[in-house]
Amino acid sequence: MKYQQLENLECGWKWQYLINKWKDGEPVTRYIDKSEIEAAVQKLRAIEHEPTHVLSWIEEHMSSELDNKLKQAIRAKRKRHFNAEQIHTRKKSIDLDYRVWEKLSLKANELGCTLSDAIEYLLSEASRSEKASKTVNSLKEDLSRLLAE
């Protein structure tokens, strides 16, 4: 699915991505010399409020190894951004204990589906089981009443 590209917004995301990588200690420039690296990072930090300048900084200074990773990160961010606009595509996150995640993951693999689909399947199965149990109990009560008469 294609999503609209918004230059200003995406340039801000690119700037944030590069700054985060730099803060994590990963090389964001193509340079080896420390002074060149520092100068390039200073330029990057200086253009925080001028997002469109990030594109020229990327062309001029960014490490080629980071190119694909940056594109993938921005593509994922764009997808999440546009999916968050509609309630049916908005994602929610939950915390699971490791053992619960492991069981859910095994069930999802067994069913050949995603974790979300597995949860939905298990809930619908539990609901059907509950309805069947109520029906059986109701039949037992009716039968007991008939036999008592």
Curated annotation (Swiss-Prot):
Subcellular localization is given as: Cytoplasm
- Where is it found, in Gene Ontology cellular component terms? cytoplasm
Q: Which InterPro entries match?
A: Arc_rbn_hlx_hlx, MatP, MatP_C, MatP_N, MatP_N_sf
Question: What GO molecular function terms would the record report?
Answer: sequence-specific DNA binding
Stretches that traverse the bilayer: none
One BP annotation, GO: regulation of DNA-templated transcription
Where primarily located? cytoplasm
- What disulfide bonds does the UniProt entry report for this chain? none
Q: Which UniProt keywords apply?
A: Cell cycle, Cell division, Cytoplasm, DNA-binding
Q: What does this protein do?
A: Required for spatial organization of the terminus region of the chromosome (Ter macrodomain) during the cell cycle. Prevents early segregation of duplicated Ter macrodomains during cell division. Binds specifically to matS, which is a 13 bp signature motif repeated within the Ter macrodomain.
- Report the sequence similarity comment from the record: Belongs to the MatP family.
Assembly, per entry: Homodimer.
This one is known as: Macrodomain Ter protein
Supply the source organism for this entry.
Answer: Vibrio cholerae serotype O1 (strain ATCC 39315 / El Tor Inaba N16961)
Give the gene name.
matP
